[in-house]
From Swiss-Prot:
PTM annotation, UniProt: N-terminal cleavage of acetylated cysteine of immature actin by ACTMAP.
EC number of this enzyme: 3.6.4.-
Organism listed in the record: Drosophila melanogaster
Keyword entries, A-Z: Acetylation, ATP-binding, Cytoplasm, Cytoskeleton, Hydrolase, Methylation, Muscle protein, Nucleotide-binding, Oxidation
Protein name per its UniProtKB record: Actin, larval muscle
Catalytic activity field: ATP + H2O = ADP + phosphate + H(+)
One record GO biological process: mitotic cytokinesis
Source lineage: Eukaryota, Metazoa, Ecdysozoa, Arthropoda, Hexapoda
Length: 376
C-alpha cells in the first residue's frame, strides 16, 4: 500500500453496487449496494436516533420498513441528491477518508449524456472539495485489469451492458454499442416469472430477495430448447430456496430462463439484439484489419457476466456468427465482478497517469466542461 496520505481513491459507482477503495490495492475495501432507503412508516420511539435516510448495507438490512431507491438507473445518475448521499457515505463511513485530501477516480458507462459527467465533476470539486479527479470509461478499465491493450469488452452490470472495442489502448467510439438490458431487468423478469408459479414478490424490499435468488441459483443454458425439455421431463434441475420468513420455494426452469433474456431480449418485450449479437455487431463496425484480434480477445466484465455457463454459451453463439476460419476466445476472469474497480486501481497508480488528473485549479479556470477535454 502506498502512503495513504495522498493515495488516490477509486470509486466505481455501479447502478447496483458501489465499489470503493484505494489506488494500488488489489481489491475494493468497500462494496455496498447503491441504495438510498427512506422510512415508509412514522417513527414513534423517541431517542432511538432514527435517521430520515439510510444508505447501502444499512438500508439493505432495514429494507422491511424502508422504501428503497437506486439513484443510478441504466448507468445514468438520475437522482443527484441521493447520489451525493452515496458518495458522502463512501468517503466518510466506508473508506473513512477526507475527500479534500485525495484525488478521486470515478467511472461511468460509455455513451452517457455529457451533462452526467459534468455534474459528477462539479459535485466532486464543489461539494467534496476534491484536489483532483478523473472520469474513466468502465469497459476500458476492465481491459486494463485483464492485462490487455487490445480486445472487445462486454461489460454488463446491474443497469447497463455495453460492448467497447479497444485497439492498442484506443477505444473505438464509433463501434461502441450500448444495451439497456442488464441485471436489474433480469431481476424484474425473475419476479414476473415467479409470479406465474404463484409466488408473489412486489415491493422494493422483496425485489432484493429475488435478486439474491437470481445470484445464487441462475445459470445460462448451452442449448436453451434442450434445457427446457429436460426441465419439463424431470425434476433434476429444480432447486429450493428458503425465504427470510422460513418458507421454502422451489424453482426449476426459471433458473436458466432468467439469464436467457440476455441472449433473447424478446423475453422482456425488447426489440434489441442479444449480447452475443451486440458483440458481433460491435466487431463488424471496426476496421476489417483488426477484427481478428478482437475475436480472439472477448473480455467479459461486470456482475451480470457471473452466471455459470455464460462463457461457453458466448463462445458457441459468436462462433455461429463469425467466419468459420476465425479463432474465437472468450476471456472470463474470475474477479470480473470487480474488474472495473481493479482496472481503476491500476490506472490511478500508474506514474504516467499522474498528469491526467483534472486539478481543482483547472476546474476553477474552465468549469465543468473541462472533463470532456481531459477524459476520453
Amino acid at each position: 500500500m502506498c502512503d495513504e496520505e495522498a493515495s488516490a481513491l477509486v470509486v466505481d459507482n455501479g447502478s447496483g453496487m458501489c465499489k470503493a477503495g484505494f489506488a494500488g490495492d488489489d481489491a475494493p475495501r468497500a462494496v455496498f449496494p447503491s441504495i438510498v432507503g427512506r422510512p415508509r412508516h412514522q417513527g414513534v420511539m423517541v431517542g432511538m436516533g432514527q435517521k430520515d435516510c439510510y444508505v447501502g448495507d444499512e438500508a439493505q438490512s432495514k429494507r422491511g420498513i424502508l422504501s428503497l431507491k437506486y439513484p443510478i438507473e441504466h448507468g445514468i445518475i438520475t437522482n443527484w441528491d441521493d447520489m451525493e448521499k452515496v458518495w458522502h457515505h463512501t468517503f466518510y463511513n466506508e473508506l473513512r477518508v477526507a475527500p479534500e485530501e485525495h484525488p478521486v477516480l470515478l467511472t461511468e458507462a460509455p455513451l452517457n449524456p455529457k451533462a452526467n459527467r459534468e455534474k459528477m465533476t462539479q459535485i466532486m470539486f464543489e461539494t467534496f472539495n476534491s484536489p483532483a479527479m478523473y472520469v474513466a470509461i468502465q469497459a476500458v478499465l476492465s481491459l486494463y485489469a485483464s492485462g490487455r491493450t487490445t480486445g472487445i469488452v462486454l461489460d454488463s452490470g446491474d443497469g447497463v451492458s455495453h460492448t467497447v472495442p479497444i485497439y492498442e489502448g484506443y477505444a473505438l467510439p464509433h463501434a461502441i454499442l450500448r444495451l439497456d438490458l442488464a441485471g436489474r431487468d433480469l431481476t424484474d423478469y425473475l419476479m414476473k416469472i415467479l409470479t406465474e408459479r404463484g409466488y408473489s414478490f412486489t415491493t422494493t424490499a422483496e425485489r432484493e430477495i429475488v435478486r439474491d435468488i437470481k445470484e445464487k441459483l441462475c445459470y445460462v443454458a448451452l442449448d436453451f430448447e434442450q434445457e427446457m425439455a429436460t426441465a419439463a421431463a424431470s425434476t433434476s434441475l429444480e432447486k429450493s430456496y428458503e425465504l427470510p420468513d422460513g418458507q421454502v420455494i422451489t424453482i426449476g426452469n426459471e433458473r436458466f430462463r432468467t439469464p436467457e433474456a440476455l441472449f433473447q431480449p424478446s423475453f422482456l418485450g425488447m426489440e434489441s439484439c442479444g449480447i452475443h449479437e451486440t458483440v458481433y455487431q460491435s466487431i463488424m463496425k471496426c476496421d476489417v484489419d483488426i477484427r481478428k484480434d478482437l475475436y480472439a480477445n472477448n473480455v467479459l466484465s461486470g456482475g451480470t457476466t457471473m452466471y455459470p455457463g455464460i462463457a461457453d454459451r458466448m463462445q458457441k453463439e459468436i462462433t455461429a456468427l463469425a467466419p468459420s476460419t476465425i479463432k474465437i476466445k472468450i476471456i472470463a476472469p474470475p474477479e470480473r465482478k470487480y474488474s472495473v474497480w481493479i482496472g481503476g486501481s491500476i490506472l490511478a497508480s500508474l506514474s504516467t497517469f499522474q498528469q491526467m488528473w483534472i486539478s481543482k485549479q483547472e476546474y476553477d479556470e474552465s468549469g465543468p466542461g473541462i472533463v470532456h477535454r481531459k477524459c476520453f
